[in-house]
Amino acid sequence: MENKEAGTPPPIPSREGRLQPTLLLATLSAAFGSAFQYGYNLSVVNTPHKVFKSFYNETYFERHATFMDGKLMLLLWSCTVSMFPLGGLLGSLLVGLLVDSCGRKGTLLINNIFAIIPAILMGVSKVAKAFELIVFSRVVLGVCAGISYSALPMYLGELAPKNLRGMVGTVTEVFVIVGVFLAQIFSLQAILGNPAGWPVLLALTGVPALLQLLTLPFFPESPRYSLIQKGDEATARQALRRLRGHTDMEAELEDMRAEARAERAEGHLSVLHLCALRSLRWQLLSIIVLMAGQQLSGINAVNYYADTIYTSAGVEAAHSQYVTVGSGVVNIVMTITSAVLVERLGRRHLLLAGYGICGSACLVLTVVLLFQNRVPELSYLGIICVFAYIAGHSIGPSPVPPVVRTEIFLQSSRRAAFMVDGAVHWLTNFIIGFLFPSIQEAIGAYSFIIFAGICLLTAIYIYVVIPETKGKTFVEINRIFAKRNRVKLPEEKEETIDAGPPTASPAKETSF
């Protein structure tokens, strides 16, 4: 009656996936060993920064019989902080080659080398009396974070069934925030943030990597990688059987076969070809604006220098570390709240609300810092502003851009888009980490005016350019951007192929 008359088999109905133990444990193993690393190393040098600076000064004195001057210490500490995102930039450029040659799971396993080696080096840096080991290790840890920032979402997204991808996708950001929070806890002076405990504090970053090395090999590789990249349907079928807990997987396998055919016809887009395609111009510009806005709006300035900000806002130095822990609780709660609301309120509403809160908090914080000496009571308002900023960033600018990034690109261009996204993320992260101390020293409270302006400009771009993607298929989103890019979307194109000019030649697969 239906498809039989046309000589084609009836469509295979898809079966809703459930959160099976294998999928749950694979997600936890991958996220703890990768996303946790990013969050932990992002925050671990914040609270005990005076302890690290003291070690730098003592080591320098033993070598040169004199202490560092203020400018040299500022430069060295800025390097310690900013080497992490610089390594992340390098890692983001390597990930495209690794995920295709070694697989998604294989990339995560290899990446643990870049966590275990620096953990050992930082653990012995005090005994070796070499602060250079800390600076070098921060670069290597950045490479680790840069690779996992792209490889982990790719792995989890390809493990999960369609109806669970949103939930599984939020696990990455949740573990990043948990890593930040535990680093804040362990960094307390009463625990490890002291002259005796800081080598252990830094070396702990190797523990999640070691646990992932011991557990992740027992879980399957991405079935999409096995079938589409390697052409191994038997391995993909076996992986799906373990991940789904049933043998009714023909619909999902057929979807992968269609994607494999589309990729053979279209090929992977390289980064250079992605940048040249008119049909992807607004999508590319949108992820650049979203990722640059995420970092340049000041979130890592707050993470890196939270204690200094609290002290400037009137909190006693002895108590600022506990206020930082409180901000970590706010971060976790609001990130989980965002995961709950993103499918109810939509992406645009959370982004606009988040940037609105962040920009307003920066403006009020500027006023507080300027006048708190005259009105001491304003110091409490300063703490509220910092907490409000963290809440605003956690509800939108921090967790939502990775969701939008996945939705506005289709399969053939997604890998190249992830590389661009990662490069922008880490480059802007590096800029803030390196320049913020000098900017704060030069213009003081007015530095937060810059962040408020960036929040405003990013919000305007989102309001004018980025459509609401909630509840829309990839094809529907692609059609919206096709109109914006002023290109025609051929109706016969598969969902897995990006819109482009009909005369465009297939792009050859390259890593960059």
Curated annotation (Swiss-Prot):
Membrane disposition: Multi-pass membrane protein
Stretches the record annotates as Disordered: 491-512
Protein name, as recorded: Solute carrier family 2, facilitated glucose transporter member 7
Residues holding D-glucose: Q294, Q295, N300, N331
InterPro entries reported for this sequence: GLUT (IPR045263), MFS_dom (IPR020846), MFS_sugar_transport-like (IPR005828), MFS_trans_sf (IPR036259), Sugar/inositol_transpt (IPR003663), Sugar_transporter_CS (IPR005829)
Gene3D superfamilies: MFS general substrate transporter like domains
UniProt family annotation: Belongs to the major facilitator superfamily. Sugar transporter (TC 2.A.1.1) family. Glucose transporter subfamily.
Subcellular location: Cell membrane; Apical cell membrane
UniProt keyword annotations, A-Z: Cell membrane, Glycoprotein, Membrane, Sugar transport, Transmembrane, Transmembrane helix, Transport
Species: Rattus norvegicus
Residues exposed to the Cytoplasmic side: 1-21, 100-107, 160-172, 220-281, 343-350, 401-415, 467-512
Role summary: Probable sugar transporter. Even if its physiological substrate is subject to discussion, it is able to transport glucose and fructose. Does not transport galactose, 2-deoxy-d-glucose and xylose.
Residues in the Extracellular compartment per record: 43-78, 129-138, 194-198, 303-321, 372-379, 437-445
Top-rank lineage group of the source organism: Eukaryota
GO terms, molecular function: D-glucose transmembrane transporter activity; fructose transmembrane transporter activity
Pfam families: Sugar_tr (PF00083)
Listed PROSITE patterns: MFS (PS50850), SUGAR_TRANSPORT_1 (PS00216), SUGAR_TRANSPORT_2 (PS00217)
Residue ranges crossing the lipid bilayer per the database entry: 22-42, 79-99, 108-128, 139-159, 173-193, 199-219, 282-302, 322-342, 351-371, 380-400, 416-436, 446-466
Catalytic activity: D-glucose(out) = D-glucose(in); D-fructose(out) = D-fructose(in)
